[in-house]
Amino acid sequence: MILACDVGLKRIGIAALLNGVILPLEAILRHNRNQASRDLSDLLREKNIQVLVVGKPHESYADTNARIEHFIKLVDFKGEIVFINEDRSSIEAYENLEHLGKKNKRLAIKDGRLDSLSACRILERYCQKVLKNH
């Protein structure tokens, strides 16, 4: 199974590829990086993930890239890790919330649903890249 994550300072959005369908999963709320890396490690083990797709911004965001790379090194995972450009994934995910009212949009941001929709976009990009190369 393939899992994607959108690593943020407060939340980690999660999406999975199940039988060819990309689905958002419940986001991991970050209290600190050790707790978040343990939670992600547990999820990867529970779901028997073989490939972890991680969103990274454009290389001009050096601090953010270093933070994401450091966090991923804390994750206990022996499978394949693939980094995919995440530029505009959060904006595209937010556009998917257009049907919600203001209050529900704010809640979707706070509870991590937006982050998991962003992880869906990252996973879509990975799938497009893999299909293009085959």
Swiss-Prot record:
Keyword Zinc-finger: no
The protein's Enzyme Commission number: 3.1.-.-
Disulfide bonds: none
Keywords in alphabetical order: Cytoplasm, Hydrolase, Nuclease, Ribosome biogenesis
Highest taxon listed in the record's lineage: Bacteria
Cellular component terms per the entry's GO annotation: cytoplasm
Pfam families: RuvX
Single GO term (MF): nuclease activity
Places the protein is found: Cytoplasm
UniProt enzyme class: hydrolase
Gene3D superfamilies found in the cross-reference section: YqgF/RNase H-like domain
GO annotation terms (biological process): rRNA 5'-end processing
Family: Belongs to the YqgF nuclease family.
Function per UniProt: Could be a nuclease involved in processing of the 5'-end of pre-16S rRNA.
NCBIfam families: PRK00109.2-2 (NF001026), RNAse_H_YqgF (TIGR00250)
Descriptive protein name: Putative pre-16S rRNA nuclease
Provenance organism: Helicobacter pylori (strain ATCC 700392 / 26695)
